[in-house]
């Protein structure tokens, strides 16, 4: 075949590492044409040696470029040099970070065998004969030949900023990164006035820390010193965001440097921070311009946990909100919470169907610790959310605040990887390592990260490598445990001093101007300090919850008109023409038809979908997530139907007439902590939305215990942070063993105080319907609180747990239910049995098989917390001859609700009336592993509860 000539195609599409591959294949082709891929062989036969167009600048104009065409030589010796040069260039790209100058304390050894010329049998003269474009097609104009290209690549990849992107598999992304990095397009060209402004910012950062260090001796502040450049880095990300008219930036970070970020990025007034150090009243200070939502709960939190929000406006009057999330000391657990904020800020929930997401509306910045990033499992859980349809936020910018130590633990004891950031490689996240002593390089890293996030909607990691000037906190003496590192740190100049020296050497600023800048900052801090009252001993802090929290929940209408329920019910059973529902499932669903016309029975899942449909008609958006939640763990829900022939999905709740808000249900990844934290964050940011998280079994909720403890139960008391999150925890003893029986209700009751949440264990479908509708009605009210429901498993289809249709039309949620048919003759009742949840249905089932039980009454406590004291008191008062109040439960005595209920029942028991317990004895494990043993225990408990003592 005759070779085509005079045209660079198809080779013009190859450059950089891709061109290197083509060159290597061509070398192999010259040795043995049959040793390569047939398609590539055909290209070489048709087009000959690869041809390349290299941009060439005329001698008199460095910016104007023409193109010169080169064809690969067919001489094996010259060709091998070209292949070697391409390999060298690729090695610099891939391994330059290993010798880069990113450690501010210790200079790395610059020599690495795989980056040296002799490793590839190359000389400077060899490289000078090679065109630039073979090695660095995006090089600036001053790079004239292959030798210049190698020097350029070494400078780019081994300086104060280093790059890792070989883990990025997407070719478009990798090529874009190469183009940005090697052309220098991402690196900002700062004017002198911008450099002076940067120095001023560093002076503010350092001055703030030094002032606190001198003024509040020995108080914890978790100084930013050594990572001062983090503040201008954040400034740059905020600047980029508002320039691109993003609506919201949400930040999550731990305690290190938090006060500085609050002051300088969030605009929290110095006076407020100083007042917190002095335990003085701080709420009277007017926030600085734009600073809003600095909130407190009634018990409060330490100053370096508090969040804040700020509004900024750009020149075109676009307003952007910056939020720093409230955070406990538990490292990294705020990460999914912030992503929940971000997703909520991105979605329009005002129309029926799936919420419309705009990832340009908001983005998240997560600031990690170098020990915590590889050490805390929730980091990996959160990274895994990044590309999932139910959780993606269009890319998070991660900043590792890397001070090369964790408390007293050196990096060699805290991770098994080269870098703190290495775990992110498993998620194909590009990584930049940057020396925190070079603030301009830090700005460049921010620019690259933001541009990548905006273009590809994916995560990006900035490994900001600095140090910690003092100990873990300001009372620690690090020389005792880390003497080598701190001997260097104690002699190391600050970032501000280094940058000031650099600007003075360039003639951009004078020493006098630097001194004046320091004095101005010090004076501002002094004035702020003097405004803070010093009368801390006279303060009378009130630590009582506000009245809406203390008060009982208001009465809200949860019943729905019969005609509305009938119409909604029938709409839920209509499918598009040609949509093929699985036959067995369709038969089950069709049984629901006509239930309101015939006053039939409604089971649990049916009640749930009716509640959801009517809530949507009330204009309340709904978001439900959990493992297998679309179908339901127990195949009960089926909110998403699948065409058995095409796999197409159909969601009946998207097609309800009169719906005014969005509905979505997502199957979550096999993760509890990150997903629950995400849903909590979503609900906090979008309080008008009914957000539900469902555990696959309640037993697995303790994988997210930190979220219950640090956020959901206590967030309002600590931070004033309201939530109406609903948690569905399948619970009940059915012989499935110790890991599929108990949602550990005792833990939620132990945490219950100050009306911080509602804990319910329901026994009927109508109760579930009404409590969901009540929660939806309270979402935007001050009385809102999280709702924990111990949901059933065996009751999902149990006829005694199903409810008459009329209860949905005329009923309401009742915290207490009484067993029908018992207690009619008040004078004969001697025992009142109290219990909750699924066991109440077991008792009801057994009662149906028994003779007269006029000596017995049974009361179901449907809402355990807040305890329905008045309702229980009224029931007890109806029975003048009662001798015994009994609490019955399936759980062991040291678990379940007994320890919570015992003192309450004793307080309500009339004089001379015993309070006793029936249930499993104290156990280390929640349940038996053998179903036969389980059945015998259940039978014993039921028998004891229903047997009269003679």
UniProtKB/Swiss-Prot annotation:
Q: What is its EC number?
A: 1.2.4.2
Q: Which reaction does it catalyse?
A: N(6)-[(R)-lipoyl]-L-lysyl-[protein] + 2-oxoglutarate + H(+) = N(6)-[(R)-S(8)-succinyldihydrolipoyl]-L-lysyl-[protein] + CO2
Q: Name one Pfam family in it.
A: E1_dh
Q: Where does the source fall among the domains of life?
A: Bacteria
Supply the NCBIfam families for this chain. 2oxo_dh_E1, PRK09404.1, PRK12270.1
Q: What does this protein do?
A: E1 component of the 2-oxoglutarate dehydrogenase (OGDH) complex which catalyzes the decarboxylation of 2-oxoglutarate, the first step in the conversion of 2-oxoglutarate to succinyl-CoA and CO(2).
The record ties this protein, via HAMAP family, to:
SucA_OdhA (MF_01169)
Q: What is this protein called?
A: 2-oxoglutarate dehydrogenase E1 component
């Amino acid at each position: 075949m005759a070779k085509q000539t005079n045209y660079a195609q198809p080779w013009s599409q190859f450059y950089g590492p891709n061109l290197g591959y083509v060159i290597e294949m061509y070398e192999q082709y010259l040795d043995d044409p049959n040793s390569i891929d047939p398609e590539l062989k055909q290209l070489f036969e048709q087009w000959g040696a690869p041809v390349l167009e290299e941009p060439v600048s005329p001698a008199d104009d460095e910016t104007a470029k023409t193109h010169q065409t080169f064809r690969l030589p067919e001489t094996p010796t010259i060709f091998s040099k070209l292949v070697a040069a391409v390999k060298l260039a690729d090695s610099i790209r891939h391994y330059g970070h290993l010798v880069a100058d990113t450690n501010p304390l210790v200079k790395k050894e610059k020599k690495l065998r795989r980056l040296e010329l002799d490793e590839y049998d190359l000389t400077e003269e060899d490289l000078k004969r090679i065109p630039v474009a073979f090695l660095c097609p995006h090089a600036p104009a001053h790079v004239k030949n292959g030798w210049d290209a190698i020097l350029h690549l070494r400078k780019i990849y081994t300086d104060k900023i280093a790059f890792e992107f070989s883990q990025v598999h997407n070719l478009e992304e990798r090529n874009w990164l190469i183009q940005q990095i090697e052309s220098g397009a991402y690196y900002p060209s700062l004017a002198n006035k911008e450099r002076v402004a940067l120095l001023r910012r560093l002076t503010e950062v350092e001055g703030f820390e030094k002032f606190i260090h001198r003024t509040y001796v020995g108080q914890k502040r978790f100084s930013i010193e050594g990572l001062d450049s983090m503040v201008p880095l954040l400034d740059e990300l905020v600047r980029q965001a508002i320039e691109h008219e993003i609506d919201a930036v949400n930040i999550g970070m731990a305690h290190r440097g938090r006060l500085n970020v609050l002051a300088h990025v969030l605009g929290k007034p110095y006076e407020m921070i100083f007042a917190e150090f002095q335990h003085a009243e701080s709420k009277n200070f007017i926030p600085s311009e734009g600073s809003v939502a600095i909130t407190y709960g009634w018990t409060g939190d330490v100053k370096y946990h508090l969040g804040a929000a700020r509004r900024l406006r750009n020149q075109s009057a676009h307003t952007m909100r910056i939020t720093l999330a409230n955070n406990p000391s538990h490292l990294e657990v705020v990460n999914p919470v912030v992503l929940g904020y971000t997703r909520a800020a991105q979605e329009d929930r005002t129309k029926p169907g799936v919420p419309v997401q705009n990832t340009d509306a908001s983005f998240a910045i997560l600031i990690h610790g170098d020990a915590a990033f590889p050490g805390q499992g929730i980091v990996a859980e959160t990274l895994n959310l990044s590309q999932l349809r139910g959780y993606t936020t269009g890319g998070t910018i991660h900043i590792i605040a890397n001070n090369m130590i964790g408390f007293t633990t050196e990096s060699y004891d805290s991770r098994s990887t080269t870098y703190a950031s290495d775990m992110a490689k498993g998620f194909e996240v590009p990584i930049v390592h940057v020396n925190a002593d070079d603030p301009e390089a830090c700005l460049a890293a921010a620019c690259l990260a933001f541009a990548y996030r905006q273009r590809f909607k994916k995560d990006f990691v900035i490994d900001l490598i600095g140090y910690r000037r003092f100990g873990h906190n300001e009372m620690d003496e690090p020389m005792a445990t880390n003497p080598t590192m701190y001997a260097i740190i104690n002699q190391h100049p600050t970032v501000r001093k280094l940058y000031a020296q650099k600007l003075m050497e360039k003639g951009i600023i004078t020493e006098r101007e630097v001194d004046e800048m320091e004095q101005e900052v010090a004076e501002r801090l002094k004035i702020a300090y003097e405004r803070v009252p010093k009368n801390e001993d006279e303060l009378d802090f009130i630590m009582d919850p506000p009245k809406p929290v203390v008060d009982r929940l208001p009465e809200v209408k949860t019943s729905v008109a019969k005609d509305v329920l009938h119409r909604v019910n029938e709409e839920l059973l209509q499918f598009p023409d040609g949509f093929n529902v699985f036959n067995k499932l369709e038969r089950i669903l069709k049984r629901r038809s006509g239930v309101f016309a015939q006053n039939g029975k409604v089971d649990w899942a049916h009640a749930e979908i009716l509640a959801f449909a009517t809530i949507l008609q009330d204009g309340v958006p709904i978001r439900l997530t959990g493992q297998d939640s679309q179908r339901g763990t127990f195949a009960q829900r089926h909110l998403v139907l699948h065409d058995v022939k095409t796999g197409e999905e159909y969601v009946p709740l998207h097609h309800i007439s009169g719906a005014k808000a969005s509905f979505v249900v997502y199957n979550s990844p096999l993760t509890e902590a990150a997903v629950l934290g995400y849903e909590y964050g979503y609900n906090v940011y979008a309080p008008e939305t009914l957000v539900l998280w469902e555990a696959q079994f309640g037993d697995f909720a303790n994988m997210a215990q930190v979220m219950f403890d640090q956020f959901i139960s206590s967030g309002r008391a600590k931070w004033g942070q309201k939530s109406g999150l609903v948690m569905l925890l399948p619970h009940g003893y059915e012989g499935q063993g110790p890991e599929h029986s108990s949602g550990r209700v005792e833990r939620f009751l132990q945490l219950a105080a100050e009306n911080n949440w509602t804990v319910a264990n329901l026994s009927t479908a109508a109760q579930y319907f009404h409590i969901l509708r009540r929660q939806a009605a309270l979402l935007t009210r001050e009385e809102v609180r999280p709702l924990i429901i111990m949901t059933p498993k065996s009751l999902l289809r149990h006829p005694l747990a199903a409810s008459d249709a009329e209860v949905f039309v005329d009923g309401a949620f009742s915290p207490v239910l009484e067993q029908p048919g018992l207690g009619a003759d008040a004078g004969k009742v001697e025992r009142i049995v109290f219990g909750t949840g699924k066991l109440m249905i077991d008792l009801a089932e057994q009662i149906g098989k028994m003779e007269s039980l006029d000596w017995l009454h049974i009361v179901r406590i449907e809402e355990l917390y807040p305890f329905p004291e008045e309702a229980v008191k009224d029931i007890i008062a109806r029975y003048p001859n009662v001798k015994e109040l009994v609490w019955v439960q399936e759980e062991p005595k040291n678990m379940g609700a007994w320890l919570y209920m015992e003192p309450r029942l004793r307080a309500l028991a009339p004089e001379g009336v015993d309070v006793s317990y029936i249930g499993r004895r104290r156990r280390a494990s929640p349940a038996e592993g053998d179903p036969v043993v389980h059945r015998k225990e259940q039978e014993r408990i039921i028998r004891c509860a229903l047997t009269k003592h003679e």
